[in-house]
């Protein structure tokens, strides 16, 4: 496992990689970023929406910590997991109940992302996207949100025109959300990319890291500026850790430099 937060430290690992393998190092063609907490500023808004939706349906004791632990998962799966904690009668945890709670959650999120003045990209996101594009690396987003919420966010931050973001995938567009690899695979197919070793994944939760591993990505980078801390991400074996998106760019630049040698 390789853990670091500086581009320079990456070179030692890359040199070892290059020594051990005689075949050329794969060229990075695609970077897939998570949205809320990774590229979109979030102040527990998603976790609070979970709390409100569950409270409306008779589950007032869901904590922010419990909700945050489910960040990154598809939202119906997150709701099911939270119900398993707070509903002792398992027969009451039906698909119908989950759908009702999810509908309330979606409506809350649609209203929030459409109207709240705090919605913005995280620091350096657009600069990092532009730098990757100039390096010939496509940029994509995947998310535990459904497509309707995803589209609202893309419109609010000005990423819907395809200039900075080449593709996106929402959890309701694939058979299984994270940590399954289906969203990354959908994006790869859309962009005509066939080798997962030319793809890197970046996200702030355990399921982001595991999604990257399950997709066979070259790198699965955990970013510690969101929900999960470095200590919480390490057990899930990220190939790299970064404190922010600027450090992600340093990691990519260091890899590209070594790949040219």
Language model features with spans:
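Non-catalytic pre-domain segments flanking phosphatase-related domains
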Residues: 5-33, 258-261
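N-terminal helical cap/lid subdomain that shapes the substrate entry/recognition surface
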Residues: 26-123, 130-135, 151
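Substrate-recognition/cap helix-loop segment adjacent to the acidic, metal-dependent catalytic center
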Residues: 57, 82-86, 126, 133-140, ...
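Short acidic capping loops at alpha-helix termini that bridge into adjacent secondary structure
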Residues: 62-65, 161-167, 195-200
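Short beta-strand/loop segments at the ligand-binding rim of alpha/beta enzyme cores
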Residues: 138, 194-198, 216-220
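Acidic, Mg2+-coordinating phosphoryl-transfer loop and its flanking beta/alpha structural elements
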Residues: 201-240
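Short acidic, glycine/proline-enriched helix-loop-strand junctions
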Residues: 232-246, 252, 259-260
